[in-house]
From Swiss-Prot:
Homodimer. GO terms for cellular component: cytosol. One of its GO terms (molecular function) is ATP binding. Belongs to the class-I aminoacyl-tRNA synthetase family. This is Tryptophan--tRNA ligase. The lineage of its organism: Bacteria, Pseudomonadati, Pseudomonadota, Gammaproteobacteria, Alteromonadales. It comes from Shewanella oneidensis (strain ATCC 700550 / JCM 31522 / CIP 106686 / LMG 19005 / NCIMB 14063 / MR-1). It catalyses: tRNA(Trp) + L-tryptophan + ATP = L-tryptophyl-tRNA(Trp) + AMP + diphosphate + H(+).
Length: 332
């Protein structure tokens, strides 16, 4: 039986967090046996905001090494850097011609980023979702792991693919959102009503995958709980979001049920919960960081992974691009 094709990626801007790991990267690793997986470092998306060129190159290597340290296996998955597969931008341009201005102007992420980067509202930022559609449609992906912030972009991808298929006959697979069964949503440490984000300006909200263990413990000691007296360790997202976030985090790392954690911390102070959460996070990160350091030091191996991944991705992408070019009247 043919495995479903899945594609996902992360920008090499800002260090990947425990939220990225528990909410996405762990699922990427788990899917490698059941799916045909393509995982890319989306550096072309990163340049919609100004980047230091050398820092961006280093960040691409950092992100690639982190993928591998988390368990992404280049023998099982196609792992590549987006800009090393030129078919992404080639298809992106073609799809621009089948996307309406009104559709893009409704994208909430464009509105948010325009406010954040008011001095650099460029066409690339506006057309970002079309390149994302090309990323997905190039490989005929069936399933796309998406967070809440990317759902709207996936809907646009489906609309573009359907429009093209209606005009030229079956060309693109219509991708479905993939919602993992056991995906953990890690919230901000200081503001547990919002998701932990690697682009958060307040670094006390975030724990990076390469964070120093002492810094991890310090941040978790400062994590928001509540002012209940006496303290009550109970999972209640509506009334106790901070405590619930710490319980969810521990459960996601240790595999313990929320109920057993509630029983374990019954009658204890919030400091006990924070300390235990810190130890769980550090215990998860230390072996990952060790693998990362070894991989990041081996530039020849990273180059080999990039080269093999790009070759594989290009061969697959070219099949779709050729089909599209033929249908729209370009010489191939």
């Amino acid at each position: 039986m043919t495995k479903p094709i899945v594609l996902s990626g992360a920008q090499p801007s800002g260090e990947l967090t425990i939220g990225n790991y528990m909410g996405a990267l762990r699922q990427w690793v788990a899917m490698q046996d059941s799916h045909d997986c393509l995982y890319c470092v989306v550096d072309l998306h990163a340049i919609t905001v100004r980047q230091d060129p050398q820092a961006l190159r280093e960040a691409c290597l950092d992100t690639l090494a982190l993928y591998l340290a988390c368990g992404v296996d280049p023998k099982k998955s196609t792992v590549f850097i987006q800009s090393q597969v030129p078919q992404h931008t080639q298809l992106g341009w073609a799809l621009n011609c089948y996307t309406q201005m009104g559709e893009l102007s409704r994208m909430t992420q464009f509105k948010d980023k325009s406010q954040k980067h008011a001095n650099n509202i460029n066409v690339g930022l506006f057309g970002y979702p079309v390149l994302m559609a090309a990323d997905i449609l190039l490989y005929q992906a069936n399933e796309i792991p998406v967070g809440q912030d990317q759902k709207q972009h996936l809907e646009l991808t489906r609309d573009i693919a359907t429009r093209f298929n209606n005009a030229y006959g079956e060309t693109f697979t219509i991708p479905e959102p993939f919602i993992p069964e056991h995906g953990a949503k890690v919230m901000s440490l200081q503001d547990p009503l919002k998701k932990m984000s690697k682009s958060d300006d307040n670094r006390n909200n975030v724990i990076g995958l390469l964070e120093d263990p002492k810094a991890v413990m310090k941040k978790l000691k400062k994590a928001m709980t509540d002012s209940d007296e006496p303290p009550v360790v109970r999972f209640d997202i509506e009334n106790k979001p901070g405590v619930s976030n710490l319980l969810s985090l521990m459960s996601g790392i240790t595999g313990q049920s929320i109920a057993s954690l509630e029983a374990e911390f019954e009658g204890k102070m919030y400091g006990h919960l924070k300390g235990a959460a810190g130890e769980a996070v550090v215990g998860m990160l230390e072996p990952l960081q060790e693998r990362y350091r070894a991989l990041r030091a081996d530039r020849a191996y990273l180059d080999q992974v990039m080269r093999a991944g790009a070759e594989n991705a290009q061969a697959r992408a070219e099949v779709t691009l050729k089909k599209v070019y033929e249908k729209i009247g370009l010489l191939v």
